Amino acid sequence: MALQHDVKQEIINTYQIHGTDTGSTDVQVAILTERIKQLSEHLKVNKKDHASRRGLLKIIGRRKRLLAYLYRHDPQRYQQLIERLGIRG
């Protein structure tokens, strides 16, 4: 279940650090967060879709690793990002 191109482009434009940035940690985490939201909604309807559940757990793990990397290298940017995304209460 991939993101639509226009949705992905909008996320990139919102979270990019500079004009040509498409793959910074911030952008990657924002894209993964959107995919997690979509998969969570899918799994609310399709409770027995275990393949998607496994994919969701894999995506959550990838986002967790990226957030840990960002926290180690730039804690201030990490804090700003999680506030903007509304994750981790």
Swiss-Prot record:
GO terms for molecular function: rRNA binding; structural constituent of ribosome. The keyword Oxidoreductase does not apply. One of its GO terms (biological process) is translation. Gene3D superfamilies: 6.10.250.3130, S15/NS1, RNA-binding. SMART domains: Ribosomal_S15. Keywords: Ribonucleoprotein, Ribosomal protein, RNA-binding, rRNA-binding. GO terms for cellular component: cytosolic small ribosomal subunit. It comes from the Bacteria. The keyword Nucleotide-binding does not apply. It holds the Pfam family Ribosomal_S15. Belongs to the universal ribosomal protein uS15 family. PANTHER family: RIBOSOMAL PROTEIN S15, BACTERIAL AND ORGANELLAR (PTHR23321), SMALL RIBOSOMAL SUBUNIT PROTEIN US15M (PTHR23321:SF26). Part of the 30S ribosomal subunit. Forms a bridge to the 50S subunit in the 70S ribosome, contacting the 23S rRNA. HAMAP family: Ribosomal_uS15_B. One of the primary rRNA binding proteins, it binds directly to 16S rRNA where it helps nucleate assembly of the platform of the 30S subunit by binding and bridging several RNA helices of the 16S rRNA. NCBIfam families: S15_bact (TIGR00952). This is Small ribosomal subunit protein uS15. It comes from Thermosynechococcus vestitus (strain NIES-2133 / IAM M-273 / BP-1). The lineage of its organism: Bacteria, Bacillati, Cyanobacteriota, Cyanophyceae, Acaryochloridales.
